[in-house]
Amino acid sequence: MAKGSKRVVRKRAEKKNIANGIAHIQATFNNTIVTITDIAGNVISWSTCGTMNFKGSRKSTPFAAQIAAEDAAKKAMEHGLRSVEVRVKGPGSGRESALRALSSAGLNISVIKDVTPIPHNGCRPPKRRRV
């Protein structure tokens, strides 16, 4: 008996129809990660400087953060996103440029929050670099 060939049927990514969301910008010294979620925290789209083909020290530039934020915003706007609440975390150089890129991509920014974690004298920080 011949076996019938089984064809794998993949589900297409559904287009969610979401008007409001949250844009999380994590700006570290080496990279910038932009994640756009709905109000509940489910990820709609994301982008990083590394996925936009910036490698090494070029990932930490404001221009790379701008390109990554524009990419994440375009992906999210395909799902119907119009306005976002922005939460910025970290001390990196891509904070402001990623924020500007989100607004210039066509998203309406309602609130900007800085959610950088600040220790109340917790862990010992890394030692100073001697270059």
From Swiss-Prot:
Any matching Pfam family: Ribosomal_S11
Keyword entries, A-Z: Ribonucleoprotein, Ribosomal protein, RNA-binding, rRNA-binding
One BP term from GO: translation
UniProt GO molecular function: rRNA binding; structural constituent of ribosome
PROSITE patterns in UniProt: RIBOSOMAL_S11
Gene3D superfamilies xref list: Ribosomal protein S11 (3.30.420.80)
Annotated GO CC locations: ribonucleoprotein complex; ribosome
Signal peptide as annotated in the record: none
Record text on subunit structure and interactions: Part of the 30S ribosomal subunit. Interacts with proteins S7 and S18. Binds to IF-3.
Family under the similarity heading: Belongs to the universal ribosomal protein uS11 family.
Annotated function: Located on the platform of the 30S subunit, it bridges several disparate RNA helices of the 16S rRNA. Forms part of the Shine-Dalgarno cleft in the 70S ribosome.
Designated name of the protein: Small ribosomal subunit protein uS11
Species for this entry: Syntrophotalea carbinolica (strain DSM 2380 / NBRC 103641 / GraBd1)
Gene: rpsK
